[in-house]
Amino acid sequence: MIEPAQAMVSKTEVDKRRLRTMLQRDDIAQIIEDYDRMKLRIGMTASHSALDICDGGIEEGFPTVAYCQEGRHKTYANYFKTKRSSSGRVLRGMVDKAIVMPSFNDVMNDSMQVEMRKRNVVYIPNRSFTSYSSIEDVENKFRVPLFGSRNMLRMEERTEEQDYYWILDKARLSYPEAI
């Protein structure tokens, strides 16, 4: 008979397995080789923080692509659509392109990722990205360059043992007390 403790896989073993399947830096470096670095675009999940990302992207001179869920797209496709002068200067707005999909998770479709790569999209992972798509899919299947560390996204999850509070604790930095 197998004892329950023996049947359980250690957390360290689970972490090792996860790292073996996670897209590696070399995988993304290979993808970036095909990018036209003069035509980079900023992409993001079109949720509450997307306008902040778009505003920053436009301010830094990057075209923006908001990946929207059908029925929640008008804010990005209509109200904040970028209007540019004939020289390309932004007159108003901050969303150059709104891609409307049935579900936010459709960014995980291979065909959608191919289109993102053709557009030279660098994806900014906001909280909604890892809420609507599983963290495992983001780590293992999202073959689009991300701004930031793919390895650190798991720490944003509130259910992880080693979450952002754990990092703050280890760094001996203060944070609000849980109520």
Model regions and ranges:
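A composition-driven signal for long, intrinsically disordered, charge-rich low-complexity tracts
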Residues: 5, 61, 148-150
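A generic structural motif
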Residues: 60-64, 93-94
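Generic beta-sheet signal
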Residues: 40, 64, 121-123
